[in-house]
Amino acid sequence: MKKWAFVSDFDGTISKKDFYWMVIDKYFSEGKELFKDWKAGKIKDIDFLATVFQSIHQEEAHIIEEIHTIPIDEYVPHFIKNVQENGGDFYILSAGTDYYIHHILKKYDIKNVTVFSNEGFFHEKNIHMRIDQNDWKYSERYGIDKSKVIQKLKEEYELVFFAGDSEPDSHPAVFADLTFAKDALQDMLEEKGVPYISVEEFTEIEEYLINKGLISR
């Protein structure tokens, strides 16, 4: 088995703003009501995101420019490099879409990172998702079952760390060896009795991994 892997959610964990909020704020004001319906459990996560992502109505070059404005935790590129240089593999696990994630990785010249997410593509001025119901990690609610991904990685690595911030992350956190939780995820894991380390940024995560001897200074 390989020694260790670090798996991170993207929106709200690596990035400081969810991509869907950027779309709603700039191009789809009706999405604010849809957001309420989603949070009330009236629509599934994947249906909410599909509707938002198909409401941009912009040329692809402009969409990519907008994606590049998404703020991220500035330390993340350095953190990923440190994980990789210390024998770890870094993965991104997102219930959004890999379309904007790959553009962010390219912007920051982040390499050798596997992205597990819903497949996204540009078509007729919007972002669409290609959901395969026969895929091993398919979820009817999220498009991707994050728990299945963590469980599969646990078969390959001695240690699997996870970082997340919101409800979809509460499920894979159960299976990770240790979860670093931001924002709303902290209370959710508290309620479920799932152990976690409370963090706000990746410098704190790195400090923990240094103290555990996984990353050298």
Predicted feature residues:
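An N-terminal domain-start capping segment
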Residues: 1-11, 69-81
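Active-site neighborhood of HAD-like aspartate-dependent phosphohydrolases
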Residues: 1-54
